[in-house]
């Protein structure tokens, strides 16, 4: 469910195919400390805004912060079955863009409304990490719950994207769920380890050192909100990810992909979540949500 990933991969894969590889190939890229610091600053400021939203039911959803007319239109569209997508950007305290040297920060919001399901059914599905490989395939090749303590989860995803070339990643994530009241929950997911897999599914399979790879995905955080209201559940997800930058001289060609394709990926994630919940509501899902 994280997974607004295929977009970033597609953009970077295209860049690799259209640019000369540096000595030793694209695997020479290194995640530098200053890049990590910039990403962490971006996350910290974003979480400060999210903390304010989840502190009270009337501010809970991101769309609740829209001006009144726009908010009414957005909620009506969600209730009609539309999928809301918006590109977000967090700036520093002086309003300046936060630049991650040698990297790109991708930040998108997706929202859906699923009628006829409860908050408990929704939580049951999204916490069933052993079945995420069924819900979010083909990008999620394998999913596994490693440990759970109350509302804290440690999970594993094996991710794969086939586009021009094939990229496989082994990833670990810490996920934390927070109850606000009986109708409002939210969660936060943090990648703790992302390793690119070379020669995947062969006897020569091995992981490249984390942070010393092709830069397809260095970090990804996901922020989910769940609100039971109006006869169903509103679901929002913000995805913040860090990838390598676009090679010099190709921005004119690659930038449109970087700015638009992440939207398509998160749209897939939200749509798959809604589809699985709807199937469970109608009794057509093997996951049997809420049972």
Residue positions per predicted region:
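Eukaryotic helix-grip
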Residues: 25-290
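Long, low-complexity intrinsically disordered segments that are proline/alanine-rich
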Residues: 19-25
């Amino acid at each position: 469910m994280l997974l607004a990933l295929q977009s970033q991969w597609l953009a970077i894969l295209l860049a690799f195919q259209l640019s000369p590889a540096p000595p030793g190939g694209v695997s020479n890229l290194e995640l530098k400390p200053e890049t990590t610091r910039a990403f962490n600053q971006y996350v910290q400021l974003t979480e400060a805004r999210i903390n304010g939203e989840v502190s009270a039911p009337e501010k809970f959803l991101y769309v609740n912060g829209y001006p009144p007319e726009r908010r009414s239109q957005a909620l009506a569209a969600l209730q009609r079955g539309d999928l809301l997508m918006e590109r977000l950007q967090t700036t520093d305290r002086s309003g300046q863009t936060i630049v991650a040297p040698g990297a790109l920060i991708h930040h998108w919001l997706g929202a859906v409304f699923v009628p006829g399901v409860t908050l408990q059914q929704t939580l049951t599905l999204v916490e069933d990490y052993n079945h995420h490989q069924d819900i979010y395939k083909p990008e999620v090749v394998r999913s596994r719950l490693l440990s759970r303590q109350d509302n804290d989860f440690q999970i594993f995803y094996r991710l794969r994207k086939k586009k021009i070339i094939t990229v496989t990643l082994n990833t670990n994530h810490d996920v934390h769920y927070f109850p606000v009241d009986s109708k409002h929950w939210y969660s936060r997911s943090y990648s703790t380890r992302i390793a690119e897999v070379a020669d995947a599914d062969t006897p020569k399979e091995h992981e490249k050192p984390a942070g010393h790879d092709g830069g397809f995905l260095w970090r990804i955080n996901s922020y989910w909100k769940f609100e039971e209201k109006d006869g169903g559940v509103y679901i929002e997800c913000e995805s913040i990810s860090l990838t390598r930058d676009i090679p010099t001289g190709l921005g004119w060609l690659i930038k449109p992909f970087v700015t638009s394709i992440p939207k398509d990926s998160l749209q897939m994630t939200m749509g798959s979540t809604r589809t699985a919940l709807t199937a469970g509501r109608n009794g057509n899902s093997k996951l049997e949500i809420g049972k």
